[in-house]
């Protein structure tokens, strides 16, 4: 599913009117109908609930006023509009909606009467829509904080008021929505870092316009990864295949300081369905694993001061060819020293396989980007690692990750995942794929090592690196959904993610057949 900016929505509505004779007022009526249907289906006994509708001076407020009329017309009378209109220039469509509503529903001034909101069960937020690009007034900041502290169910129209729909930036303060009912397509800002704590479940309303028409008009190359998109990626495993044909993965990493990371990656690769996983680690720490993880094939490497020695480079490249390795992951637990730097840099220059580069290996890539441009490689940095690669602050990365990621892949023609809430995958053609999951459960030690193994595992099984990144990001995130369903909202570990992986993958396969 495409994600869109406010400008793209503006162009969409203009073309719908110009080319299909669909006027904006009809779209507003359809939006109100969509909102009404959601409220009626989601909340039992809706006619007996007190509903507050917050309306601003723009078309978002027009949607809210139209909703009030729909509710009233369907016998739901416990409605009050709290308006933010005094002294404001109101939109033409809002004027029409106010005229249609007449005096059927009580309208109060939110600046004067906001404390009365504590008496309402449901709050529909239509103050600001996708056009907000400035910081909100101090009075509204205070009111938004008051509303957020009430603990009421908040349903936002298009986007929670106070969020920049293009960047996800909080414009001073924003409402924390339990549900966001967004029109046509989801907005980019809903899935940006700044908005994570303000955006609940996102539900898309098509407003009676076929998705084929919308996609034909909207040129966005930012995509939300959903079940429909995954249908074109995931494959059903062949029943007759043997282990040698199920994919061979090599994990390179480990050091005397970090013994756990590479084993997490190796086990994750196995759990994706890879037939054979080889683990190349310093000889001394390979002895730690052997008795505990018999499924893994160990390749002991010469070490120097507890780190992988540069002398192993030729041996590793030989193993890749001799054993028919199809995908490699380098970095988990590998540590930082001069030998490791030389090993990582020369390995990436010489290797000709699909490669996942993660963790400390990312510390050495900045100086060789030109040498490896165009290779079948994916970097998987978190914000801190990305900041070192592109020499930008972590704060800048978090606020401008789409722009920074696009600039990076356009210049170096590499694959890139910027990890974090709603992780982003960038392919070399500058398409962006947004992971729908932003759960804090995934922020746990070793979670990134698991993702590395997942991507390498899928890559070895015949998936392109792009497909492996999209699918891997999704099942990694979906594991948190499964954990919440059966275990609760705390306590997910990297080892738990590995155990859950087959369930997450199986669900993707099951939905492919629906």
UniProtKB/Swiss-Prot annotation:
<dbReference type="GO" id="GO:0110051">
    <property type="term" value="P:metabolite repair"/>
</dbReference>
<protein>
    <recommendedName>
        <fullName>Bifunctional NAD(P)H-hydrate repair enzyme Nnr</fullName>
        <ecNumber>4.2.1.136</ecNumber>
        <ecNumber>5.1.99.6</ecNumber>
    </recommendedName>
</protein>
<dbReference type="Pfam" id="PF03853">
    <property type="entry name" value="YjeF_N"/>
</dbReference>
<feature type="region of interest" description="ADP-dependent (S)-NAD(P)H-hydrate dehydratase">
    <location>
        <begin position="226"/>
        <end position="514"/>
    </location>
</feature>
<dbReference type="InterPro" id="IPR017953">
    <property type="entry name" value="Carbohydrate_kinase_pred_CS"/>
</dbReference>
<feature type="region of interest" description="NADPHX 1; for epimerase activity">
    <location>
        <begin position="129"/>
        <end position="135"/>
    </location>
</feature>
<feature type="binding site">
    <location>
        <position position="161"/>
    </location>
    <ligand>
        <name>K(+)</name>
    </ligand>
</feature>
<keyword id="KW-0520">NAD</keyword>
<feature type="region of interest" description="NAD(P)H-hydrate epimerase">
    <location>
        <begin position="1"/>
        <end position="218"/>
    </location>
</feature>
<keyword id="KW-0630">Potassium</keyword>
<keyword id="KW-0521">NADP</keyword>
<keyword id="KW-0456">Lyase</keyword>
<feature type="binding site">
    <location>
        <position position="449"/>
    </location>
    <ligand>
        <name>(6S)-NADPHX 2</name>
    </ligand>
</feature>
<comment type="function">
    <text>Bifunctional enzyme that catalyzes the epimerization of the S- and R-forms of NAD(P)HX and the dehydration of the S-form of NAD(P)HX at the expense of ADP, which is converted to AMP. This allows the repair of both epimers of NAD(P)HX, a damaged form of NAD(P)H that is a result of enzymatic or heat-dependent hydration.</text>
</comment>
<feature type="binding site">
    <location>
        <position position="333"/>
    </location>
    <ligand>
        <name>(6S)-NADPHX 2</name>
    </ligand>
</feature>
<feature type="binding site">
    <location>
        <position position="125"/>
    </location>
    <ligand>
        <name>K(+)</name>
    </ligand>
</feature>
<keyword id="KW-0547">Nucleotide-binding</keyword>
<feature type="binding site">
    <location>
        <begin position="419"/>
        <end position="423"/>
    </location>
    <ligand>
        <name>ADP</name>
    </ligand>
</feature>
<feature type="domain" description="YjeF C-terminal">
    <location>
        <begin position="226"/>
        <end position="508"/>
    </location>
</feature>
<keyword id="KW-0067">ATP-binding</keyword>
<dbReference type="InterPro" id="IPR004443">
    <property type="entry name" value="YjeF_N_dom"/>
</dbReference>
<feature type="binding site">
    <location>
        <position position="60"/>
    </location>
    <ligand>
        <name>K(+)</name>
    </ligand>
</feature>
<dbReference type="GO" id="GO:0005524">
    <property type="term" value="F:ATP binding"/>
</dbReference>
<keyword id="KW-0511">Multifunctional enzyme</keyword>
<feature type="domain" description="YjeF N-terminal">
    <location>
        <begin position="9"/>
        <end position="215"/>
    </location>
</feature>
<feature type="region of interest" description="NADPHX 2; for dehydratase activity">
    <location>
        <begin position="382"/>
        <end position="388"/>
    </location>
</feature>
<dbReference type="InterPro" id="IPR029056">
    <property type="entry name" value="Ribokinase-like"/>
</dbReference>
<dbReference type="Pfam" id="PF01256">
    <property type="entry name" value="Carb_kinase"/>
</dbReference>
<comment type="similarity">
    <text>In the N-terminal section; belongs to the NnrE/AIBP family.</text>
</comment>
<feature type="region of interest" description="NADPHX 1; for epimerase activity">
    <location>
        <begin position="59"/>
        <end position="63"/>
    </location>
</feature>
<dbReference type="GO" id="GO:0046872">
    <property type="term" value="F:metal ion binding"/>
</dbReference>
<keyword id="KW-0413">Isomerase</keyword>
<dbReference type="GO" id="GO:0046496">
    <property type="term" value="P:nicotinamide nucleotide metabolic process"/>
</dbReference>
<dbReference type="InterPro" id="IPR036652">
    <property type="entry name" value="YjeF_N_dom_sf"/>
</dbReference>
<dbReference type="GO" id="GO:0052856">
    <property type="term" value="F:NAD(P)HX epimerase activity"/>
</dbReference>
<dbReference type="InterPro" id="IPR030677">
    <property type="entry name" value="Nnr"/>
</dbReference>
<keyword id="KW-0479">Metal-binding</keyword>
<dbReference type="InterPro" id="IPR000631">
    <property type="entry name" value="CARKD"/>
</dbReference>
<comment type="similarity">
    <text>In the C-terminal section; belongs to the NnrD/CARKD family.</text>
</comment>
<feature type="binding site">
    <location>
        <position position="158"/>
    </location>
    <ligand>
        <name>(6S)-NADPHX 1</name>
    </ligand>
</feature>
<feature type="binding site">
    <location>
        <begin position="439"/>
        <end position="448"/>
    </location>
    <ligand>
        <name>ADP</name>
    </ligand>
</feature>
<dbReference type="GO" id="GO:0052855">
    <property type="term" value="F:ADP-dependent NAD(P)H-hydrate dehydratase activity"/>
</dbReference>
């Amino acid at each position: 599913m495409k994600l869109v900016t406010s400008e793209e929505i503006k162009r969409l509505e203009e073309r719908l009117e110009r080319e299909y004779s669909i006027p904006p007022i009809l779209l507003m009526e359809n939006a109100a109908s969509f909102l009404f249907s959601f409220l009626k289906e989601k909340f039992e006994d809706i006619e007996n609930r007190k509903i507050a509708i917050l309306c601003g001076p723009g078309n978002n407020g027009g949607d809210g006023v139209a909703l009030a009329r729909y509710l009233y017309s369907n016998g739901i009378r416990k409605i009050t509009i709290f308006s933010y209109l005094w002294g404001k220039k109101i939109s033409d469509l809002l004027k029409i909606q106010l005229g249609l509503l007449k005096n059927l529903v009580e309208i109060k001034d939110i600046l004067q009467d906001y404390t009365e909101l504590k008496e309402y069960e449901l709050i529909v937020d239509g103050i600001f829509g996708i056009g907000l690009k400035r910081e909100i007034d101090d009075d509204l900041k205070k009111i938004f904080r008051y509303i957020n502290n009430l603990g009421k169910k908040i349903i936002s129209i298009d986007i929670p008021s106070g969020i920049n729909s293009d960047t996800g930036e909080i414009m001073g303060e924003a409402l924390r929505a339990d549900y966001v009912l967004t029109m046509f397509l989801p907005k980019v800002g809903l899935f940006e870092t700044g908005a994570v704590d303000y955006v609940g479940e996102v539900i898309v309303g098509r407003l009676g316009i076929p998705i084929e028409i919308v996609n034909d008009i909207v040129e966005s190359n930012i995509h939300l990864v959903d079940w429909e998109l995954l249908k074109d990626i995931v494959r059903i495993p062949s029943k007759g295949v043997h282990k040698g044909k199920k994919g061979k993965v090599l994990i390179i990493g480990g050091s005397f300081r970090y013994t756990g990371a590479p084993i997490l990656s190796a086990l994750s690769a196995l759990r994706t369905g890879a037939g054979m996983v080889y683990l190349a680690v310093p000889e001394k720490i390979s002895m730690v694993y052997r008795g505990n993880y018999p499924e893994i094939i160990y390749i002991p490497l010469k070490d120097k001061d507890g780190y992988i020695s540069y002398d192993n480079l030729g041996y590793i490249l030989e193993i890749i060819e001799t054993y028919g390795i199809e995908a490699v992951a380098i970095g988990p637990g590998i540590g930082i020293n001069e030998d490791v730097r030389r090993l990582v840099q020369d390995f990436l220059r010489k290797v000709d396989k699909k490669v996942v580069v993660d963790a400390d290996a990312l510390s050495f890539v900045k100086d060789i980007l030109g040498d490896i441009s165009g290779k079948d490689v994916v970097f998987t940095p978190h914000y801190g690692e990305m900041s070192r690669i592109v020499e930008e602050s972590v704060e800048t990365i978090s606020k401008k990750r789409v722009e920074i990621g696009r600039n990076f892949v356009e210049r170096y023609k590499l694959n890139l995942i910027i990890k974090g809430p709603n992780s982003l995958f960038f392919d070399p053609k500058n398409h962006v794929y947004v992971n729908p999951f932003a759960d804090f459960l995934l922020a746990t030690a070793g979670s990134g090592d698991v993702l590395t193994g997942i991507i390498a595992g899928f890559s070895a099984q015949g998936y392109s690196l792009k497909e492996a990144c999209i699918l891997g990001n999704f099942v990694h995130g979906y594991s948190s959904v499964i954990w919440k369903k059966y275990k609760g909202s705390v306590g997910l570990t990297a080892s738990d993610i590995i155990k859950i992986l087959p369930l997450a993958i199986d669900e993707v396969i099951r939905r492919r057949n629906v």
